[in-house]
Amino acid sequence: MELLILQGLQQDIKIFLLSPILCAIFRFLFIYFFAPNKTYKGQEKKWCSCFNYGFWWGMDFNAYVLLFLFLLVTLPSLGLESIYVHGDSIRVILGTLYFLVVYIAFLGKLIFYYHYKDTYNSNLRLGRNADKRNLLDIFFNQNHGGWILLSLPIYTVGIYYFLSWILALGTFAVPTVHLGYIYYVYNALITIATVIVYYWFRYGGTFKHRNKPEWDTVPEVVKRDMFFAKACIDDLIAFELAIRAKPQEILAHSDAETIQILTPLIKVEQDLVGTIWNSMRKKAAGPRIKKPKKIFLIVEESYSQFAFDDIYKDIPIANAGRLIREQSSTISIDNFLAGGLISQPSISSMLNGIYDVNLELNEKAYFWNHQLPTSLGKQISELGYTCSLWYGGSLSWSSLGLFAKGNGFHNIYSGFDITSNDTPHTWLGVYDHLFLEGIQQKLDENNTDNYEFHFIYTTSNHGPYTIPIEKYGFEKEALLKELPDYLHKHTEDIGTYAYCDYYLSQFVRYVQETYEDSLVIVTGDHTRRLPMPCQDKGRVHRLREDISTAFYLSHKDFDKSLLNGVRIGTHMNILPTIMELIAPKEYEYVSLFPSLFEQQAFIVTPYHWLSNSHIGFFKDQRVETLEGTPVYDYNLKDVVALQRAYMEVTGAIVRHQL
């Protein structure tokens, strides 16, 4: 009897070996398309270590190709003639399906990296509540979605015929066994050996589960280049890690665990939630300016500090905003963190006064009907202000209308409510200049002497950058003349940013002129990576440039020394800063963070952190000086403890309040 099991196993191995080869090809393409530094000469060790470690880490999925083909085709073919006859066809179909999934994961990673400059991460799970029409708009208009979809059948057919050709190649001759029991012993031994080999590959060339490849053990030579460190993660592995990173974990902690985790931030002896709230109670030192009749907190979509750095001085991207920031009565902070990496958790954190931690608190019905002691709308209204929220898009986005009402806002306006039915808009919202004109018209119509707080959130500075800005004062030809040649391909991107900055700044000037005593605060909901404003191929985006959002505040009585040289801040400082500017002496308010009038050694969010000398990103364990020099030996122990404590505050409150 021929040992047909060996013949089938050889066919399985052919497809199995193709798996890491295909992943390596996709890894190379990812590096080719996106790596800031593609230099090979002199960096051979980094390249080789990246591909070697990626090979073994990828086996966490690819090893299953060997196991499943062996179990689903080779073993059954020993007893079922129909499977034996059609075995190669079954292998080709199964292999094609797997490689199609690998290809889709690769394309998804390219798109994800294009927008977030990261491989798949926890933002992935927030997509279920995103505006699907906007996602489709971005996919087809910014990411060449039509070509991507066209590539799927072409790739599938190509892989199918390639696998058919591979399996049609000859195999080594297999021995013949004449004794029946020896035949079964050989089959059993080969089966056991195959399973053992599967485990050996799946555990990264070891039989010890704890030695499996993971982020913490990426070779140091690779980790020093953060892009290559991410590139060594196969696409399906990155997708799995993102899906498994469940933010709900903090909701499963016991009170005893919470008390322990909170220790670096809050000492709790009894009454966990009461102690948390009491720790946030603060007394205002007394007003620093006369109580303004109008306060404007403007959150510009993707408004990034990078655009205001000196390196962008000669690029016409934020010229209007620069002029506002240069006013003697305007104070800006150049190192400023949002409460989230993307819009939803950022806005949720700002309004609730506690970090959202990707729990999507804005989508929970409790927050549509209840306020926290830290709620922005509630606390500002208690100072005597009528609070209005203005959003450029639909109020159904992230349940913003319901959430803002629950937060304490008296009036909620959509961009579609304050403009005509035929007003041009993207899938996200009304074009910024028309949205801001609509607000201006409403304010002029209802001009009163009342105390009013206006939270304004725009939408246009967002992909796919299809707004016809040439109709609104930004001629493409004129922009091309001002841009260096190497930035011409980014005209739509830069032009859209300049358009948004210009009309935002026009609105700020309108507020300053119309309401002379107004307090104006401007920030971004998060950052977005801007085109590199120089041709230096060796220069990579610095961490601060990637995650520091823009921030400034303006009032006629301000001078540049008001904040005593504070260099760092976060969205969570905004509410207490308003309180310390206008609240009566000894007025009590509730805030997770102090105001910007206090020097802070560390600012920590669930995602990133700042000190007066360093900036860090938790997911990658990446640390740089504020000037952009990488730091590889920074002791993160205390910072991580603070990160966990701030997240635990949210977990404890949600567990006990909801």
Language-model regions, residue ranges each:
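Short, highly charged low-complexity linear segments
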Residues: N129-D137, A168-A173, A256-L262, E363-W368, ...
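A sequence-level detector of short, solvent-exposed, charge-rich linear segments
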Residues: E44, F70-T74, L78, Y116, ...
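Transmembrane and membrane-interface helices of multi-pass
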Residues: M1-I250
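Glycine-centered secondary-structure boundary/capping sites
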Residues: L80-Y84, K117-N123, D137, N143-G145, ...
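The feature marks either
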Residues: F140, D225, C232-I237, L241-S279, ...
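General structural signal for secondary-structure boundaries
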Residues: T39-K46, Y116-L124, F140-G145, P247-P264, ...
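Solvent-exposed soluble domains appended to multi-pass membrane proteins
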Residues: K267-L658
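Exposed alpha-helical structural elements
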Residues: L4, G8, K46, N134-L135, ...
